[in-house]
């Protein structure tokens, strides 16, 4: 039994083994079995896709699920501290899947709990299972994770999905990674210092769009701007439009962790590069296999 706090809790070989097991699950050659297990989904921050996909993943493997989707539904709203909540949850479940607004909260929970903790998003720090889904999608599309050219577009400072992706790529030797964002939303220096592959920071996706194998888009977060006019200006300038995508190679891929707001023109959905709904379809099978490996893999 293990915790999943960061993508770097896995080795390269462990990630590839997880992906191979997910392949077998999708082809009918493997079925995760969690009969008699209980999964607690502790979402102190609102979530739709992640919470529901973990619930579906657990149920499809035969586990029971209990949990909450807001701290307002818990004793935290009465002043209970996180450590006490985690100690209570592990009395009820065999694994805790947790999302929390504070950076480092998942690591703290894992230190408190004797049962495994899976990080479903901790503040702006990481979202490891989303990165696993993203990289699984890339592998399915390209047949490899090595030597590819990636672009990350949008909010690269606060998007925890981007942090996890940049970290997981240290295991797979990309050709180059382009970081495309407004100056105020550049990737944080401490993240860049961890990277062992070529990186170039840009402000316009059009400069490199024809080179990309994978374009990973994130939404510009309104809550990060004090000036509403500045937000609207930045949001519109980082909106992926139909004409820009027409300049991409047909075999390249656009990914997005979702939810999408207005950062991808909806006309792009029918273009061959649009792979974000395919990406989302892999969430339940991969998380089902991951839950099996966390709770029953040994």
Swiss-Prot record:
Family under the similarity heading: Belongs to the aspartate/ornithine carbamoyltransferase superfamily. ATCase family.
SS bond list: none
Organism: Metallosphaera sedula (strain ATCC 51363 / DSM 5348 / JCM 9185 / NBRC 15509 / TH2)
Pathway connected to this protein: Pyrimidine metabolism; UMP biosynthesis via de novo pathway; (S)-dihydroorotate from bicarbonate: step 2/3
GO terms for biological process, alphabetical: 'de novo' pyrimidine nucleobase biosynthetic process; 'de novo' UMP biosynthetic process; amino acid metabolic process
Keyword Mitochondrion attributed: no
Record Gene3D superfamilies: Aspartate/ornithine carbamoyltransferase
Keywords of this entry: Pyrimidine biosynthesis, Transferase
Residues where carbamoyl phosphate binds: 49-50, 99, 127, 130, 258-259
Subunit (UniProt): Heterooligomer of catalytic and regulatory chains.
Protein name: Aspartate carbamoyltransferase catalytic subunit
Residues at which L-aspartate binds: 78, 160, 219
Principal EC category: transferase
Top-level taxon: Archaea
GO MF annotation terms: amino acid binding; aspartate carbamoyltransferase activity
Pfam families: OTCace, OTCace_N
Function summary: Catalyzes the condensation of carbamoyl phosphate and aspartate to form carbamoyl aspartate and inorganic phosphate, the committed step in the de novo pyrimidine nucleotide biosynthesis pathway.
């Amino acid at each position: 039994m293990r915790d999943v706090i960061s993508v770097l809790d896995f080795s390269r070989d462990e990630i590839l083994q997880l992906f191979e097991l997910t392949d077998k699950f999708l082809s009918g050659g493997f079925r995760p079995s969690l009969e008699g297990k209980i999964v607690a989904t502790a979402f102190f921050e609102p979530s739709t896709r992640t919470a529901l996909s973990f619930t579906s993943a657990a149920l499809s493997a035969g586990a029971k699920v209990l949990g909450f989707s807001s701290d307002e539904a818990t004793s935290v709203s009465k002043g209970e501290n996180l450590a006490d909540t985690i100690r209570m949850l592990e009395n009820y479940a065999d694994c805790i899947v947790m999302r929390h607004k504070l950076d480092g909260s998942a690591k703290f929970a894992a230190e408190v709990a004797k049962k495994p903790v899976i990080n479903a998003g901790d503040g702006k720090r990481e979202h490891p299972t989303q990165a696993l889904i993203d990289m699984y999608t890339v592998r399915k599309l390209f047949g490899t994770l090595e030597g590819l050219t990636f672009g990350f577009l949008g909010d690269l400072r606060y998007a925890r999905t981007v942090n996890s992706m940049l970290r997981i790529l240290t295991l797979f030797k990309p050709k180059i990674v382009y970081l495309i964002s407004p100056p105020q939303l550049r990737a944080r220096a401490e993240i860049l210092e961890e990277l062992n592959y070529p990186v170039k920071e840009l402000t316009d996706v059009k400069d490199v769009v024809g080179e990309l194998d994978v374009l990973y888009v994130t939404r510009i977060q309104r809550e990060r701007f004090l000036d509403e006019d500045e937000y609207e200006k930045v949001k519109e300038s980082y909106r992926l439009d139909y004409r820009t995508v027409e300049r991409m190679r047909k075999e390249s891929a656009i990914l997005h962790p979702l939810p999408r707001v207005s950062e991808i023109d909806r006309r792009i959905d029918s273009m061959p590069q649009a792979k974000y709904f395919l990406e989302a379809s892999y969430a339940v099978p991969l998380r089902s296999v991951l839950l099996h490996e966390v709770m029953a893999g040994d």
